[in-house]
Amino acid sequence: MLNKCFIKNYNYNIQLVRYIESKHSNTFQIIKDYMDTLVYSVKSKFDDYDIALLTMLFETKRMSQNTKVKRVYLYNSYSFIHQNYITALLKEAFKGVIEIVEKDTLNLTYEGLQKKNVDIIISNVKLEIKDIPVVQISDMPTDKELSKIKKLL
C-alpha cells in the first residue's frame, strides 16, 4: 500500500510539471530535446520532473536578469520627515523595483535629472518636465496613485 506522503508528493510533482511545461513551453522543450540527446552519452533517463526543475532554474535566472531597477526622483514640498516617510512607503511598496535618487544630490533641472539617469519623477506638486514621466501624488499616496506608479514601472 502506498503511503499518503508519497501520493501527495507525486500529485504535486505532476501539477508542477504541467504548470512549468505550460508556462515556459519553449524552454521546457529545448531542455527536453537536449536531455534526450544526452541520454545516449550518460546512459541515464531524465523524466519530466527533472526537466521541469531545470526549466525552473533557467527561467529563474532569466527573470531575475530582466528586472531593471527604476531610478525615482521624489519631489516633495513638505518637511524632511514627510520626505523620508514617503520614501520609505515607496520602497516598501516597490521592493527591489525602485531606487530613490537622493534629493540633496540633484538640481531639479532636466539636465540634472538626466545626469542621474532618473526614470520617473514622483511629486506632490505639479511639475512640467519634458521626456521624463511625472506622477503627481497626494500628500499621502493613495492605492490608486501607487497603482498608477506601478504601471509606469
Swiss-Prot record:
Key words of the record: Plasmid, Transcription, Transcription regulation
Coiled coil start-end: none
InterPro entries assigned to the protein according to its UniProt record, in alphabetical order: BglG_antiterminators
Superkingdom of the organism of origin: Bacteria
Similarity annotation: Belongs to the AtxA/AcpA family.
Protein name: Putative trans-acting regulator pXO2-62/BXB0076/GBAA_pXO2_0076
Organism this protein belongs to: Bacillus anthracis
